[in-house]
Swiss-Prot record:
Keywords: Disulfide bond, Glycoprotein, Protease inhibitor, Repeat, Secreted, Serine protease inhibitor. The keyword Acyltransferase does not apply. The lineage of its organism: Eukaryota, Metazoa, Chordata, Craniata, Vertebrata. This is Ovomucoid. Residues 4-54 form the Kazal-like domain.
Amino acid sequence: IVTVDCSDYPKPVCTLDYMPLCGSDNKTYSNKCNFCNAVVDSNGTITLSHFGRC
């Protein structure tokens, strides 16, 4: 199981770094910050499917 530590999130601003992650909602997030903000917003219902684009 692959996981990402989102304990430091949410953050008000994300960088534009492009290191895509695929969420369990089948959406590609451009980087960890955007992914973790979505995880927090979803109350943890979104999880990491895999690294890279969906």
